[in-house]
Amino acid sequence: MRIFDEPTETKMPDKIPLARDEVRNYDILVTRPIFVKNILDEVGTGLHSRLQKIILKTGDEWQRRLTVVQANITNLNMHDRYEDFKTVSDIVVSYAEKMGSTPIKCRTSDCWGVLYKKNDFAVAHAHWPNIWSWGYYVKVPQGSSPLVFPEGKEGNYYVFPQVGDLVIFPAWIKHEVPPANVDEDRMLVGGNIERIPHKDLPLPSTEEIKNVVAPSTNLVK
């Protein structure tokens, strides 16, 4: 897994004062990592097949009440209800923990299954206040709708998923799925990931403490 973080060189005026006593939006250049990888071999065909069966069996537990996702969607606690969903969630977390500028310990906050039928769609939305959101693609018929990130600096970014693909992206960026134009169903497992607070983590071992790199004392003056 390679992380590329190459900031764009842009000449900006300095010393811009910020407003006080109010919430205001500012344009700040921030790169947003998105990770796409096929993990079907890691998940295994057995687990992959069971995920599909569970999504089909569970059906639409929201009865189209979710306005942002107009498709059949399960409740958001599938990782607590089914060991298979927990297993795939844990695999995703192992990747997500390495995606930030510094490694952090994470856990699944939500996990669900989605089945898109013909003409189903998801309007642009985000999953704040989670850190990461993700999708693992269980069934992707030929001609399926892409996953779209509509607010890219250079235009819309598209992911045309394949069966077994995993897509991890920052939870606060908007994403959408255009209406499906194929007759076959499109299925995925979705999830959100949150940071584990330090108070919930075990104390480090003596060996881990020894391996901590001490900060440099050569301060720039």
Model segments located where?
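Short, cationic low-complexity segments
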Residues: 209-221
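Non-heme Fe(II)/2-oxoglutarate
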Residues: 2-103, 220
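Catalytic core of non-heme Fe(II) oxygenases with the double-stranded beta-helix
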Residues: 104-178, 184-188, 192, 196-199, ...
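Alpha-helix boundary/capping detector
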Residues: 77, 190-193, 215
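Aromatic-acidic/polar surface patches that form glycan- and anion
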Residues: 81, 85, 127, 182
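Positively charged, low-complexity intrinsically disordered regions
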Residues: 3, 21, 126, 208-212
